[in-house]
Amino acid sequence: MWYHKLLHQQSRLRNLMKRGNIAQGLHLSNFKSLFSSSIHWCHTTSKSVNCTWHQHEDHLELQYAGTVMRFDYVWLRDHCRSASCYNSKTHQRSLDTASVDLCIKPKTVHLDETMLFFTWPDGHVTRYDLDWLVKNSYEGQKQKVIQPRILWNSKLYQQAQVPSVDFQCFLETNEGLKKFLQNFLLYGIAFVENVPPTEEHTEKLAERISLIRETIYGRMWYFTSDFSRGDTAYTKLALDRHTDTTYFQEPCGIQVFHCLKHEGTGGRTLLVDGFYAAQQVLQKAPEEFELLSKVPLKHEYIENVGQCHNHMIGVGPILNIYPWNKELYLIRYNNYDRAVINTVPYDVVHRWYTAHRTLTTELRRPENELWVKLKPGKVLFIDNWRVLHGRESFTGYRQLCGCYLTRDDVLNTARLLGLHA
């Protein structure tokens, strides 16, 4: 299950962070064979290679590095990395997949050192490095966590003492940017300190890691409690924990908050790790976790205030998981914007409400709540696909600015800096 992998990763990541080295901890150890067989295998051994394979009618079964893998012959032909099939400069496929015979079968298969060679009926030769096959096989991928994370409640996060990054260091050095992104990827939140309290400097900060995602709220948003938009956020009322833009088909990936001024009391920001809460549900009621990951719901935003007229609808389950490794990658939770439940059969509705209540109970546990007082100069970045946010009610005049960032661009920046994202 995905949480077992995450717990294992978290333990290794914490140990590595204590030693100042995180990159080496992202590789999983070899795992036991997923299949057993009594068939006759081709067997090749050397000082460095122990590899066996068997040719079936429509696929190759390969055992290497403690892994038993199965590869469809069409897949093996389609993924050929020869110069005529794959452009190594653009990293794009040149082969027309539709031209591959769906009944194709290699004439010969042989191993040379760590390379496995396939000769096809037309004489074309495909070769694969054994480690590449392990890395890209389904059996290999299902054992890997796509994005290593450290799940947290309030106590765990405070004990971690995750440092903020200085504004100038963030803007001017790759070291500062990498440190910030590493914290953000692991915890789903990160802070930048000593930012001049202006909308312009907040925008400059955001553009350092991503394109700003323009939405119905504009490019940069600036709001007070004047109810200038048809949203509870534009009031002084408390906001329960939620993720934003659940009414978009693809919710915004990252949001940025900067409190420019507050002349009053209250208004603390609430942060809850939705993945930590989901893990608790999976451990206590796995059938409810599964239901929340399969039942699609509509979320809706209807606005008719002044010149703003919008009707947005987004559809998806509360919990979104990768089907091959069951890893959670997105939580869509907003009781304010959830539309009429009309996508769920009668006999599932009550079970869904029960599962929703279980998740809500975990999200509302006081020990899972991290309260932060935002102030001028301190900018908060939130992974909107993971961490829920809210606020307590407040008095006085309060100005906030911020924006949404495109998730793909943030992850792109992280990968270019050598981070696992």
Swiss-Prot record:
Pfam families: GBBH-like_N, TauD. GO terms for molecular function: iron ion binding; oxidoreductase activity, acting on single donors with incorporation of molecular oxygen, incorporation of two atoms of oxygen; trimethyllysine dioxygenase activity. It comes from the Eukaryota. Its cofactor is Fe(2+); L-ascorbate. Its main location: mitochondrion. Keywords: Acetylation, Carnitine biosynthesis, Dioxygenase, Iron, Metal-binding, Mitochondrion, Oxidoreductase, Transit peptide. SUPFAM superfamilies: Clavaminate synthase-like. InterPro entries: AlphaKG_dependent_hydroxylases, GBBH-like_N, GBBH-like_N_sf, TauD-like_sf, TauD/TfdA-like, Trimethyllysine_dOase. Homodimer. This is Trimethyllysine dioxygenase, mitochondrial.
